[in-house]
Amino acid sequence: MNVYDKVLQFGSKKARARGMALNKLSRNRLEDIYAGSGPLVFGFGPIDMVDPGSLNPSIKTLDTVYVAAVQPDNQYVVHHFVPGRNEWVETDASTHQPTALVGVLVQDHKAKTREVEDLKSQLSQLRMEHEILRHEYERLKLKSPIVKPFKPLKVLLFSLLLGLLFAGVTNGARTGTCYAYDEEKDTCLYWEWKDSREVAWYDSYVTEALAIYNRACVYVRSKEFMTYLSLVFQTVFNWYFCATALAVYYMARAENPIVMFVTLALATLSQFQLLAVAVLPLLDFSATMGLWLSMVVFYMSQQISILVSFCVLVLSVMIGTFMADSEYAMMIKGHAVVFAIVCYSHVAMILNIPPWVVSLTMVCYRLWRVCFVFPAERLEIRSADGKVLHTVPTHPNWTAKVTRFVQSLRKGLRTSVAPTARIVPDGIAIVEAREGVGTCFRVKNNLVTSKHVVGSDDAVKIRWGAQEDMARVTYRHPTKDIALMALPTNLQTMPAYKFAKAITDGPIVMTAFDEANLLLVAVTEGVRVEDHMTYSVATRNGMSGAPITTVDGRVIAVHQTNTGFTGGAVIFVPEDIPEVRKISKREQELEDRVKQLEGMLNMDQAYVDSNLIVDLVREAVQREMKVLRTELANLGGFSQKKKGKNKSTKRKRKAVWTEEEYKAMLEKGFTRDQLRIMADAIRDQYYDDEDEQSEEEAGYPDWSDPGDSTDIENEWFGYEQSWKELEPAKSGVVVNTLPKDLVFKYSLDNYPISKQDIQAVAKELKIYEKAISDIISTSVSTDGKWKDDVDAQKILQELDGLWWGINHTLWEHGLMPFTQRRKRVQQPKKLQRGPEDPGPEECKLDYWEQLVEPSKEKFLVPPEYPLLGVVPLDRPISDFDAPVDNLLALLPEPESPDLGFEPAVWGPEAYVKSFEKFDFADPDPNIEKNYPREWAFANLVLHREFDFLADSVVKDITATSKNSESTPGFPKTYWWKTEAEYLAKRGYADYVSEWNRIRGGARPNVLWYLFLKKEILKSTKVRDADIRQIICSDPIFARIGCCFEEDQNERMKRRTKTRMPQCGWSPFFGGFNDRIQRLVAKGNPYWIEFDWTRYDGTIPSQIFKHIKNFRFSMLAKEYQTPELRNMYHWYVDNILRRYVCMPSGEITIQHKGNPSGQVSTTMDNNLVNVFLQAFEYAYLHPEKSMDELRKDWESYDSLIYGDDRLTTSPSVPNDYVTRVVAMYKDIFGMWVKPEKVKVSHSPVGLSFCGFVITHQDGQYLPVPAEEAKLLASLLRPTKKLENMDALYGKLLCYRILNHNLPNDNKFRNYILVALEVMARHYSSRGEEPPFYVTESMLDKLWRGGPKFDYG
């Protein structure tokens, strides 16, 4: 099995050989069961089987093979082979000491090996990061300014060079007349100086310049033009000016300009001039020295200079033979260039070639070389295997060291933009321990921080804002630097982080406190290395334990290291939080004893040679294991039964409640039968057989080798299971089965049928299938319910009879009945997929048009709507799932099971009916023109109510916020389930490209996906298939809308206290009372509760378009450009004229209403609501002027949320209800039911947002308006709850909602009793409820601060 098992081979050799032989026959293999485990131990032991040779069924004990080992999780596991089933089955048996101890050591060795590999990987990663950071530090390090010291030699050389250059330029000479001349001595005997000096260069240049100017004006096309042009070149390429500029430049910028000064001086004296400077990049050090020597000799004798340069060239050829090829080639090339320019200068002197011609020649040569020849700047010296040994430059410009200052001009370029991220600023707290300070955050009901922060403390101090409390350390992770603390009661309102679905490389966010309690946020790139996350952040003390989150705010790791600049974190996943289980006193004592034993073992192992491990196992722990076995045998729960004690005993009925509790529950209204049912449910769920048996449980024997292997073989291979026991038995009890599950229960589609089955009973199988199909089709409707005239019990009895008959037929033919066969697991249907790698074309908004195919048959599209075609989409259409939550059995039964509400279920007809919300009445075709007074007043109120939207901004599409866990729409649903997956794969590239494409003039048609909403509805609506439809657009289209409207939406959410719209409000902490008091302060005599029916579906298009135009007009002027205006009009047009895709793939068009899936549905409904209220007030008061309407509106106020409205008005007509219902129908085509309009003189009794207003103790407090709907969502939910904690939390939410109800309210009392019952359930499990709230806490939650004595 593994190297340890091959060497040690614990147990019986016979059992090992037999076990290996049986392993080949087994359906599951030991290689899979004990993969990665330590050494195995084989042995023989008994197993109880049915005796096949007895007429009456009896139990016979056989010998079988037992195998045991320690698995990777350090669990000692035992399996034995079960004949007949041919399978290794896990069981219990006594522990084989050597196997257990060696196995633990093996697993510990593997864990240490993995840890070492992890540390090596981390070390390698840290070394790489250190090198990168060191390089970055050197690049970014601010260099101190260099103060060049004063060098007299440099200044002296520069002065001499300038004097030499100006001396040559000025050509100054004094003139005079010689009156006596000695021809023999060639000397003037008498010379008379003139009084003035002539400046040769000044006069000649001025004269030549004037001559050139005059001749150019007169003779621009003459032959003499080229002559004057040559004079211009002579001026431009003058050596003295070039040399002077070069000297000044090197004097100002170069660190050591002496080399250049010497070259310029020698070039001036020797008349080499520009030649000497031009060839410097081609010369190495020896060639440069040769050039200087040649120029010095050239000044004295040109012929000797040629000879000297040639000798130096020959000498370098001979001496350089010992050098490397690359260096030798560069040196020879440099000296050859020196010899060439010496010869060239001599020829230029003889032919009297002007210096400017030489300069022009050199400039042309360099220009030609730059433009047409690209010589290599470096040579790579490689070995025979291609490895680069070193690199040498082809132009050894050793003087380039003087121009190193150019490198300071290099700047780093920004190559990326940090993404925007979501943080939870109040989601972290400060943890203070004896060993230091850190940061912690909440996950579920735990506070999480680094293990090194809490150290060895059992309790630490937590500071969250102004609140301080002590938290108990409950868990320290064994391998990760993570510690968990219990959440204190005072911190229950602290926001909790959620886990990320995937942890990948990319942008991460760190939110932490430093040691000065300052909130710090960092966004950077993170790289995952196995169980760690590495990143570069300037971390500080106190940041340990901070959450590392994605840009969506989901936690992925816990910050743990602080090196001053680099940061590291340990990955944090849900599996790192242990399951909480209360440890009994007996288990704690046993655990302490085992730890004591392990400590003794570790002490002994420090002195043992690794080669003597077997002796260590046998000798070192033999005494301690005997003591431990004796103690375990003396414990009642762990003691073994004596051999033969196999009779089971009847369990004792355990009392659930005390007598006082039982009487108290009777007084609360429970009947005795209800309490008996609840007690049985508690016993069935939490009954522990081990604790209730009156006799000792049977154990398994120690390992032993049987004496005769022949007996074992006879027992094994002569065994057959008794066929009589497999005979199907006909049950007299009919199990109540839901009609929608009949096919799954009685059909044979999910059972394996062999060839032998078909040969034996093919006719019977065919008859059975036909009978089952006929019964189900005639008894069950298409929506999965019993038909009205069907007796369900009779049908189920008939089906059970057929099921028993077909199974008994198989048994009679010697075939395995279906009741003994394993049903095939129904795999979920795979959705149709698109191309494997969608490109930018598939992600465009109008790509769906390429997938449309023609179709004429309507299925889900209503008759009056067009069918444009179908796309390849096959999604579930019907939903008859009404979940049955087993956890609800823990709750008491309500007084009335018929609540009038139930979960929405639907068939195909519900889709057709959902379109009726668009068709109530036709609005006036031109409301603005036919009602100008009302329209003008409504528009005036609209601007006044939403004046704070002025100068709103257009956001970048990558900075918008939207629920990314929503559907990506069609056709992106082919490749991604949510927009988050789409963004993770493609990023924002498609968003930006589509934005630019539409801004550039493209106008694609957007497809909306339609589905029905699963929610609690009135039973009458469910029966009438009146289900709400939701439509969602492509996420790119939705985020384009967010660009224009997200800033305005956020502004409206921040002004719920002073304005009408209440999207974003909170009724807690006095919020409900504050808003009602705001309306009461107006002092109006009239209060109106108003509600539309099918509000958003009947909004007239002209009203909706006017609201959208108003929103665009409130943007800042810089955003109201023609291209953005046209783009916004395209966005609005795609909302009003929508291409809708049904789950069947059908495509139709909707022309009315505000779709309930766009990003601003509620905000737009609020704007429309305000506009309609103002129009309504002006319409119902035709006698008032515009000034009077404005004055009345000062005392008019409302609270609105979509179509919900609570209004206080200074005046209401007598026939208000009749007139307002008619107005909305005739003018706007909207549906207002008279019973949905209530007029009152007090707000008490009216409702808003599902709350009825009450007045208690001087405050307006809310109570639930539909208690039956809330109770139905508890007892008949739309989906199952995860566990008891979720059920308790849901009950607690209802407890908060009904806090303000009267004490005799039935719904309130039911929730209180249910919470008490759940507390009993927790108590019976030895646990405490996860939450607890008091009356004073709820009073403060609803009423607010201490001014009402509730703070």
Curated annotation (Swiss-Prot):
Reaction(s) the record says it catalyses: RNA(n) + a ribonucleoside 5'-triphosphate = RNA(n+1) + diphosphate
Annotated gene: ORF1
InterPro entries linked: Astro_1A (IPR045835), DNA/RNA_pol_sf (IPR043502), Peptidase_S1_PA (IPR009003), Peptidase_S1_PA_chymotrypsin (IPR043504), Rev_trsase/Diguanyl_cyclase (IPR043128), RNA-dir_pol_C (IPR001205), RNA-dir_pol_PSvirus (IPR007094)
GO cellular component: host cell membrane; membrane
Active-site residues (renumbered): 452, 481, 544
Spans through the membrane: 153-173, 231-251, 257-277, 304-324, 337-357
Highest taxon above the source species: Viruses
Listed Acidic residues bias regions: 687-699
Region annotation (Disordered) ranges: 687-708, 822-842
Source organism (scientific name): Ovine astrovirus 1 (OAstV-1)
Compositionally biased spans, kind Basic and acidic residues: 833-842
Full protein name: Non-structural polyprotein 1AB
Basic residues composition-biased segments: 822-832
Keywords of this entry: ATP-binding, Coiled coil, Covalent protein-RNA linkage, Host membrane, Hydrolase, Membrane, Nucleotide-binding, Nucleotidyltransferase, Phosphoprotein, Protease, RNA-directed RNA polymerase, Serine protease, Transferase, Transmembrane, Transmembrane helix, Viral RNA replication
